[in-house]
From Swiss-Prot:
Residue ranges, compositional bias (Basic and acidic residues): 145-156, 451-461
Gene giving rise to this polypeptide: Zbtb33
Protein's name according to its UniProt entry: Transcriptional regulator Kaiso
Residue ranges covered by zinc fingers (C2H2-type): 492-514, 520-542, 548-571
Location of the region described as Interaction with CBFA2T3 in the Swiss-Prot/TrEMBL record: 298-571
Annotated organism of origin: Mus musculus (Mouse)
Location within or outside the cell: Nucleus
Length: 671
């Protein structure tokens, strides 16, 4: 019996050529099956491409037709996102549009654009904004730069051939892949107004990094900065290192050499001093897929120190990159642990602490300031949606009884200065907004739940000592939201999409979009939807019922998008204006639960069991003349008694047949 050989081949250029072909088809309008209307522009695209690239379009096209309209995004920004979807590149975007582009990418669910703000927050010259009026801004010579975001996959040996400063960001992956993301900041001599950033994903060689990295002098254009990020290694049994590729450009201006210290990393950043406060808080938002019962602790003995050297000089100088490898062999980093989450939900940058101390500045060089910060290293435990707090300073108060009251109740109060830091908090925290002071007080529950499977720390101080440990674990009370209290009004914020609700039941119903605990299946096909109204909109396409009627010409349409396009194109009017230009008829083709009408008015609430709900209807009305009101009886009421479902008639009734003249109790089916 002869042996057979199996041969496999992979075309590495297929994905790029496929995207190029699809982009050409979109440019010529070939095979485009959907039209996206943004402001006054129409974009032709392919439904499958948009659904595969955006989670928003994936949900939208399951219920929408061939024409959709987006009102929460500008046409200029959507054009850039659409070009990225069909080319995997964000090309020549102005720096002042980056924030809006990233926000739109988060709304549309485009992962690469949504997470673009995390690495770009390290580059000061990209932000284009001033901090405290003393931050360095881009000079007029920055018009000779260009901005280009590229996402490609290269081999590991291509890493040494580049001649530009590199910012590397390490991600926790499996032991087989061990991939890393790298961001290359470069300057070009083209006659453009932008900066150029190349974002690529590489597969590094499995070898140990050198223990000593030489400090090199970089001469980029004025006000451009290169920053090395301190991140833990993705492989086990290795200490956290600073991934740096030293480079040198022509005509250096200044040379500086820093002493290398064992177990610490030093970054040099060219920026101005910002307004700082004495409180120090470390926030860590773990990925949402982590189980809430699992949490990670922060021992005091496992931490690495970072020295930040800020140079304040009159003439623009270049940043110096240097770093050292830590020598502690006993520190083990788990693959799923990050120092600070790089997800878009985290509002804390990876190389800064919020807020920082203003008084701990000391002069080291000519006009330079040094500040010491502590970045904790997480042990080998799964992450959780809990808040990591180190050296939390409680809010100052002259009343010792007030502080002891919060300690007895298991609460701790901290103060944040900016609203953006609230997104990094874990669930279970209550946020109080101080309108006059422009600050926020966060009440954090610190009680331990013995049933939560959380072990106490070894270095935890006894409760009789009067001081609480700085690294105490937090118990997550809510997995789906946190509460924001402004002027006494409670807002429930979804932990996934940050959408706010004033009613907790509405948030629970909305959260089914993310959790899919309930599934609503179409009665005509096999599609499943997270909300009942999504299913209703989809089933309209099966029945073909036209509920939206134009009041100008009387034509009816199957959905709002078609009707809106008709009014804009034919009648040249805006359907979203103050004037009512269309009518929405009730649904007659679908089986919607009958409305229930209560005619027996009671002056008191009936007795209920634990699993039943009762409503007091028209309690302020007087009974008709000649009728005697009967006292309430101790009779249990159930949902089946309130909602009367008729089997023979499944069509919505618009008139009351029991002699009543008005609606007394209405619950729509979709809500």
């Amino acid at each position: 019996m002869e042996s057979r050989k199996l041969i496999s081949a992979t075309d590495i250029q297929y994905s790029a050529s496929l995207l190029n072909s699809l982009n050409e088809q979109r440019g010529h309008g070939l095979f485009c099956d959907v039209t996206v209307i943004v402001e006054d522009r129409k974009f032709r695209a392919h439904r499958n491409i948009l659904s595969a690239s955006s989670t928003y379009f994936h949900q939208l096209f399951s219920v929408a037709g061939q024409v959709v309209e987006l009102s929460f995004i500008r046409a200029e920004i959507f054009a850039e996102i659409l070009n990225y979807i069909y080319s995997s590149k964000v090309v020549r975007v102005r720096a002042d549009l980056l924030d809006e582009l990233i926000k739109s990418g988060q709304l549309l669910g485009v992962k690469f654009i949504a997470e673009l703000g995390v690495p770009l927050s390290q580059v000061k010259s990209i932000s284009g904004t001033e901090q405290d009026g003393t931050a360095e801004t881009l000079p007029s010579s920055s018009s000779d730069k260009s901005l280009d975001m590229e996402k490609s996959k290269d081999e590991a040996q291509d890493n040494g051939a580049t001649v530009m400063p590199i910012i590397t960001e390490s991600f926790s992956l499996s032991a087989e892949d061990n991939e890393m993301k790298k961001i290359i900041v470069t300057d070009s001599d083209d006659d453009d107004d932008d900066d150029v950033i190349f974002c690529s994903e590489i597969l590094p060689a499995k070898e140990d990094l050198p223990s000593n990295n030489t400090a090199t002098q970089v001469q980029p254009n004025p006000a451009s900065v290169a920053i090395s990020e301190v991140t833990p290694c993705a492989s086990n049994n290795s200490p956290p290192v600073t991934n740096i590729t030293p480079t040198q450009l022509p005509t250096p201006v200044n040379q500086a050499t820093l002493s290398q210290t064992q177990g610490s990393e030093e970054l040099l950043v060219s920026s101005a001093s910002t307004h700082l406060t004495p409180n120090i808080i470390l926030l860590n938002q773990a990925p949402l897929t982590a189980p809430p019962s699992a949490s990670s602790s922060l021992p005091n003995h496992m931490s690495s120190s970072v020295n930040v050297l800020v140079q304040n000089q009159q003439t623009p100088n270049s940043a110096v990159l240097t770093g050292n490898k830590a020598e502690e062999e006993e520190e083990i980093i788990d693959d799923d642990d990050d120092i600070i989450s790089s997800s878009p939900d985290s509002a804390v940058s990876n190389t800064s602490l919020v807020p920082q101390a203003d008084n701990s500045k000391s002069t080291t060089l000519d006009g330079s300031l040094t500040q010491k910060m502590q970045i904790p290293v997480l042990p080998q435990e799964p992450p959780s949606n809990s808040l990591k707090i180190s050296d939390v300073i409680t809010r100052n108060t002259n009343d010792p009884g007030l502080r002891s009251k919060h300690v007895m109740e298991g609460q701790k109060i901290i103060t944040l200065d900016t609203a953006t830091e609230i997104e990094g908090l874990s669930t279970g925290c209550k946020v109080y907004a101080n309108i006059g002071e422009d600050t926020y007080d966060i009440v954090i529950p610190v009680k331990d739940d013995p049933d939560g499977g959380e072990a106490k720390l070894d270095n935890e101080l006894p409760k009789t000592s009067g001081s609480e440990p700085p690294n105490k674990r937090m118990k997550v009370k809510h997995d789906d939201h946190y509460e924001l209290i402004v002027d006494g009004r409670v807002y429930y914020i979804c932990i996934v999409c940050k959408r706010s609700y004033v009613c907790l039941t509405s948030l629970r119903r909305h959260f089914n979009i993310h959790s899919w605990e309930k599934k609503y299946q179409c009665r005509y096909c096999d599609k499943v939807f997270p909300l009942a109204e999504y299913r209703t909109k989809h089933e309209i396409h099966h029945t073909g019922e036209r509920r939206y009627q134009c009041l100008t010409c009387g034509k009816s349409f199957i959905n709002y998008q078609f009707m809106s396009s008709h009014i804009k194109s034919v009648h040249s009017q805006d359907p979203s204006g103050d004037s009512k230009l269309y009518r929405l008829h009730p649904c007659k083709s679908l089986q919607i639960r009958q409305y229930a009408y209560l005619s027996n008015k009671s002056s008191a609430m009936p007795v209920m069991k634990d699993d039943a709900v009762g409503y007091k209807v028209d309690a302020g009305k007087e009974p008709p003349v000649g009728t005697t009101s009967t006292p309430p009886q101790n009779k249990s009421t159930f949902w089946e008694d309130i909602f009367i479902q008729q089997e023979n008639d499944s069509i919505f009734k618009q008139n009351v047949t029991d002699g009543s003249t008005e609606f007394e109790f209405i619950i729509p089916e979709s809500y």
